[in-house]
Amino acid sequence: MLRSLVGSEMCIRDSDNCEEIGPEMEQCIGEAYFFRACYYYRLFVNYGEVTWLTKVLDPIQEQMERPRNSRLEVADSILADLDIAIEHLNTQTNSSTMRVHKDVARALKSEVALFEGTWEKYHRAKNTPFYDKKVTDEKISSYLRQAADAAKDVIDEGVWSISKGDPNTAYRDLFITLDLSHNPEVLWWKKYDAANNIGHSVTRYLNKGGGTCGASASLVDDYLTKEGKPFVGSERDKAKVMYGDELSPDLRDPRLSQTICMPGQDLRPNGEFVFKLPPLNEESRNQNTTGYSILKYVEYNTTYIPTIDGEGKSQAPAIQFRYADILLNYAEALAELDGAANASKIKEALRPLRERVGMPEMDFDREFNTDPDYPFNKLDKYIQAVRRERRIEKALEGSRLQDILRWAAADILIIGKTPTGALFKGSSLETAYGESLQEGENLFLTGTPSDSKRYIIPFNNKHYPNGWQFNPERDYLLPIQPRMLSLTGNQWVQNPGW
């Protein structure tokens, strides 16, 4: 990471010595500022305060001995770099070059500003050690407005849109389309080419429903019903008895059955493997751990045979920013600023995500989940709605932990929680597997043997009798390596609690 920062710094420094003037030079300068902001943002998320540098240092101890800048200083500097990047980067109407452009920088700016605005708001509210003590309500609102404004700039251009198709396949298709160059939703992405040894192994591990992983019941239950209502109570309990019923697009938001495997779906080309049940009794990479097998990213329709079982031969693209991110950032920033006043704008922003899969328009009252077991049941209804929409639309895309951290929500979502999967005892899974699964050996369940309903636990929970643990006075940031403390002459102070 630090080497990458040095590369960006050198490019910015040396641009002053370049005699060439023109669009290519402008693009290079914009990219240098973008990537400096991007690398600092990654450090910022992980470690909080860091030293902001605007020149390349000589490898001399004295030059390394600098204190960390405050959170607000670092956040403001990242946003300033992105403003410069936006000024210099070119405008693009598709992602065919796979280079950053103005709207990619705006997308990152909206993410950074939303991250810091919500981080400061919620960490200050819970009085954790991690917010900037100089932050004010006005400063928090400023970040949220910047997040909304950057996203709105992209929206107002009218260049990008949500890709559409069959409501029961369009969402899934986005993540397994190998060439997204002219997809109207994708701002920036990475293309894989397995024939030239540029690939990954997602399809290999997931194309029989295993992968030594699985989705949680918490995620599955958060998808609304087809009518746009919370999936709770007797309706939920009844749908869990026959495996797969709760996943059906006739009952639930169709994004669920395009993210989690449902009986009858192809996982390999030409009908070679049709999903029936999660492989709970398999071993190693072929096992599913929760009863909910992952479908998203599985290239069931590949024509490149090595993708099916080859290590490093999967080619599903890596999307960095898509228009859905813009809409979600805009909606959340508006909800945080004033959900009631911005209700119509929030609904309008998120409507395309619902329309893609044939879901009804957002209705904050209809969707408000008051179930006592729902973790955000006391949240403002506007914020609850946009948080749910973010979780559903971006499921399994790697952003959930960062959301939990910026919302200071570990006390609600992590501490003391035991993650669970599908209903086992009291469902058709129990009948299907019979004696092939033995509790305490290759099956772990909630409750006790006398309970009529027991859910899958994805690990041996005897090692976690009190559920997941997370120290809210320490774990929102990573520890700084002792080597870094030494290099800075102890000008850097270790993060709280470490």
Give, region by region, the residue ranges found by the protein language model.
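An aromatic- and glycine-enriched ligand-binding surface/loop that stacks and positions planar moieties
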Residues: 1, 50, 83-84, 99-106, ...
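Single conserved hydrophobic/aromatic residue that forms the stacking wall/gate
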Residues: 2-12
